[in-house]
Amino acid sequence: MTEGLFLKAVLLFLVAFVGYMHSYWGSTMHNRPLIMGTLVGLVLGDVKTGIIIGSTLELAFLGAVPIGASNPPDMTAGAVIATAFTILTGADSGMAVTIAIPVAALVALFDNFQMMFLLTQAGHMCDKAAANGDYRKVEKIARISSIGNKALLALLVALGFYFGSSAIETFVNWVPEWVSHGMD
């Protein structure tokens, strides 16, 4: 892989991490596709297309809000990856939606699994620390596991971008035009 692609993957990791950290300070909503698309456009040198793709994906993910224990599709991953590949391949916003929805669903599935295993372990560690009266350790574990969770998801996005470039390009070329332009 080229050095330029690696640098873009690192920058997209940072964009995704910023998006995932929206819930760390309360729900700031800066993980929404419009914000993520704009930041991806800034990183890749095409802010206008980033805003257009982000706006389109915002409509697609309009109702994707976690309520209670529900975990909607991961719009951060969907927006970052779809915007990046749309900008790099020169595809249109219809193709961005075609890429974003399955990516968002797959990353949400991964997130559910890692929450079941990794964050459950962190919860047990917090329980033990609380039982021993070590509240500083509870806070430390909670912060590290929360930030680690977000970093893991951002890493997944960056790796998906870095290693998935050729796969996404093949997918974009394979998808029939009526699928990507179905809502025109």
Name every feature range the model reports, one short phrase each:
Residues 1-72, 76:
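Hydrophobic transmembrane alpha-helices
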Residues 2-8, 15-18, 72-91, 129-137, ...:
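Transmembrane alpha-helical segments and their short flanking loops
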Residues 15, 22-27, 57-61, 93-100, ...:
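Aromatic-residue detector
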Residues 44-52, 90-103, 131-136:
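Hydrophobic alpha-helical transmembrane segments
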Residues 55, 59-126:
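Hydrophobic, small-residue-rich transmembrane alpha-helices and their short perimembrane loops
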Residues 98-181:
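Helix-loop-helix junctions within the multi-pass membrane cores of secondary transporters/permeases
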